[in-house]
């Protein structure tokens, strides 16, 4: 028989354990409330995207305000917003969609990616030809396959199987650009050192004059959205670098590089010299810094500083938004600063914000 003293000790132990369990439960609830509760979020829905593509911002925001097309409202906003640029490349600097950024063979190819924060699902296409709504095909990869990325002609074949129409991505504009580039000695380009062409033209030596990054020749629309329920989505669409070597896939469809989001934290997207940017997974890194409590602005600035340590001439920018609705952006080696677009429920219309030193 257990003595009264031992019984008393057992009661104390059980009471202490119960107290720890109760305290742990309420601590967990407080953590979840702080991190996830939509009531604490500011001015939802919210959309941010790179550059001055403000009509894409408006379309994304209106899509989310209207309730979206599916239950994945933030993802609907991302898709429809980027679709606008893909269908109107003349309003998005010809750096998104058809009719821009031809490669060495004069072809326009497309890269795109979408990510759904609640489940971390991702779909992407790279070096896709002859299909215009690249981000919609990327979403089909996410929702209709177990894969993450499809590339090249096989991505086109998949798109056609999903009901998308094959169309020529080249235009009279890109054909003229290509003719002028060839007449100028096929410079600039992305080769290092002397190179012998396999295309039947004369030997090309000292062809390593890499194109300078700029808004007009090497760009991306990267977008992050948070809907009224607090769900986060992100996406990217691009026609890549002008005069890229055929077969090149840029940073846009690479998850963690072109864009990245987590439902508990927020999201980020980048634009710039993709061949350098993708080496750092900058969007993922910024989200992880925000996850550790860092303000989006500081996270973007730290990421840019790290890239510059290794590539001091790299040009580009990063945008980010956290679940509290705080916005951040940073850029490098852009002489005129960096513009991005924002719209939330506290604004009458979308706005272009330009950051400068």
What do these predicted ranges mean?
Residues 12-357:
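Alpha/propeptide regions of enzymes that mature by internal proteolysis
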